[in-house]
Amino acid sequence: MSDFENLSGNDKELQEFLLIEKQKAQVNAQIHEFNEICWEKCIGKPSTKLDHATETCLSNCVDRFIDTSLLITQRFAQMLQKRGGGDL
């Protein structure tokens, strides 16, 4: 019976590891999405150097997406907490 309990503990560790790896993959995918969207929005034609306006556009673009993503994540967490508490 102790082998079964250890297996269950190992399964939990594996699940946590997989969850962390999935979150890392999601962050990487989001970064690539930001890059693509902001590149299309801010870069008219590639050159050897970014001008100030382009740098500002890229920075603002990424900041907007990060702020929006954080807001959505926070709201989703709040909804889950309410649901867990039986309020939803």
Curated annotation (Swiss-Prot):
Written domain comment of the UniProt record: The twin CX3C motif contains 4 conserved Cys residues that form 2 disulfide bonds in the mitochondrial intermembrane space. However, during the transit of Tim8 from cytoplasm into mitochondrion, the Cys residues probably coordinate zinc, thereby preventing folding and allowing its transfer across mitochondrial outer membrane.
Intervals of motif Twin CX3C motif: 38-61
Family the UniProt entry places it in: Belongs to the small Tim family.
Residue spans crossing the bilayer: none
GO biological process: one example: protein insertion into mitochondrial inner membrane
Entry keyword Flavoprotein: no
Native organism: Drosophila melanogaster
Subcellular location as annotated: Mitochondrion inner membrane
This protein's UniProt keywords: Chaperone, Disulfide bond, Membrane, Metal-binding, Mitochondrion, Mitochondrion inner membrane, Protein transport, Translocation, Transport, Zinc
Coarse class of the protein's main subcellular location: mitochondrion
Pfam families per the UniProt record, alphabetical: zf-Tim10_DDP
Disulphide bridges: C38-C61, C42-C57
Protein name: Mitochondrial import inner membrane translocase subunit Tim8
Gene3D superfamilies (UniProt xref): Mitochondrial import inner membrane translocase subunit tim13 like domains
Subunit structure: Heterohexamer; composed of 3 copies of Tim8 and 3 copies of Tim13, named soluble 70 kDa complex. Associates with the TIM22 complex, whose core is composed of Tim22.
GO annotations of cellular component type: mitochondrial inner membrane; mitochondrial intermembrane space; mitochondrial intermembrane space protein transporter complex; mitochondrion
Biological function: Mitochondrial intermembrane chaperone that participates in the import and insertion of some multi-pass transmembrane proteins into the mitochondrial inner membrane. Also required for the transfer of beta-barrel precursors from the TOM complex to the sorting and assembly machinery (SAM complex) of the outer membrane. Acts as a chaperone-like protein that protects the hydrophobic precursors from aggregation and guide them through the mitochondrial intermembrane space.
UniProt membrane topology term: Peripheral membrane protein
Molecular function GO labels: metal ion binding; protein transporter activity
